Amino acid sequence: MDSVISAASVIAAGLAVGLASIGPGVGQGTAAGQAVEGIARQPEAEGKIRGTLLLSLAFMEALTIYGLVVALALLFANPFV
């Protein structure tokens, strides 16, 4: 039974990282594209747009890091074993 739990934990860890990176990846691509469009339309607002973009990218990246933390917990501090 322990081998089944270990195998399921490895699969769940892979899914946690994979699924946790899909949303932020799409969001970061969209945000960067919109920022480039905004800077092209209003070059004088470049500093404000860039600052907002970097802050929002950091928040989006935090979601991926949370998925990584869950995956590491499943692999090394498995609560199911």
UniProtKB/Swiss-Prot annotation:
PROSITE patterns from the UniProt entry: ATPASE_C
Record key words, sorted: ATP synthesis, CF(0), Chloroplast, Hydrogen ion transport, Ion transport, Lipid-binding, Membrane, Plastid, Thylakoid, Transmembrane, Transmembrane helix, Transport
Domain of life: Eukaryota
Subunit structure: F-type ATPases have 2 components, F(1) - the catalytic core - and F(0) - the membrane proton channel. F(1) has five subunits: alpha(3), beta(3), gamma(1), delta(1), epsilon(1). F(0) has four main subunits: a(1), b(1), b'(1) and c(10-14). The alpha and beta chains form an alternating ring which encloses part of the gamma chain. F(1) is attached to F(0) by a central stalk formed by the gamma and epsilon chains, while a peripheral stalk is formed by the delta, b and b' chains.
Record protein name field: ATP synthase subunit c, chloroplastic
Keyword Ion transport: yes
GO molecular function: lipid binding; proton-transporting ATP synthase activity, rotational mechanism
Transmembrane spans: 4-24, 57-77
Predominant cellular place of this UniProt entry's protein: plastid
UniProt-annotated location(s): Plastid, Chloroplast thylakoid membrane
UniProt organism field: Zygnema circumcarinatum (Green alga)
Sites annotated Reversibly protonated during proton transport: 61
Underlying gene: atpH
GO cellular component terms, A-Z: chloroplast thylakoid membrane; proton-transporting ATP synthase complex; proton-transporting two-sector ATPase complex, proton-transporting domain
Function: F(1)F(0) ATP synthase produces ATP from ADP in the presence of a proton or sodium gradient. F-type ATPases consist of two structural domains, F(1) containing the extramembraneous catalytic core and F(0) containing the membrane proton channel, linked together by a central stalk and a peripheral stalk. During catalysis, ATP synthesis in the catalytic domain of F(1) is coupled via a rotary mechanism of the central stalk subunits to proton translocation. Key component of the F(0) channel; it plays a direct role in translocation across the membrane. A homomeric c-ring of between 10-14 subunits forms the central stalk rotor element with the F(1) delta and epsilon subunits.
Membrane topology: Multi-pass membrane protein
Note: In plastids the F-type ATPase is also known as CF(1)CF(0).
